[in-house]
A protein has these predicted regions:
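Non-heme di-metal
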Residues: 1-135
């Protein structure tokens, strides 16, 4: 966050924390990630913003509230990916769409993402629907 550059320039930050490692199936990982994002936008960042505001740090409070908005969108993205995974539509659609390789930018139009990118040979997992071309 930009305010840290101004307020903490030349300082040293130390952190000590424990972070759980949860390894599961893709569906389990997406559910866990969505739950984490939910906690961040409903509890964690609003609480941080409240404290910052109470301590007179309005700019920081506003930044934290903005981060909470982004976290809500992250949750929605994870849930949409989970839905596509469960419906078998992650790499397959009922009507043609434009697929983009996230490695090299190759564009392909069709019902399914290619098994491998014909330009860079990366696997299907590197493709996503190119939303630039969606209405």
């Amino acid at each position: 966050m930009k305010f840290m550059n101004k307020d903490l320039a030349g300082e040293t930050l130390y952190t000590d924390g424990n972070f759980p490692v949860l390894l599961g199936t893709t569906a389990e990982n997406l559910k866990a990630a969505a739950a984490g994002e939910n906690e961040e936008y409903t509890d964690m960042y609003p609480s941080f913003a409240k404290t910052a505001r109470e301590e007179g740090f309005e700019e920081i409070a506003t930044a934290l509230e903005s981060i909470a908005i982004a976290e809500k969108h992250h949750e929605a993205r994870y849930l949409k990916l989970l839905e596509a995974l469960e419906n078998g539509t992650t790499f397959k659609r009922e009507s043609p769409v434009v697929w983009k390789c996230n490695n090299c930018g190759f564009i392909y139009e069709g019902l399914e993402a290619p098994e491998r990118c014909p330009a860079c040979d990366h696997p299907k997992a590197h493709f996503e629907v190119n939303t630039f071309f969606l209405g």
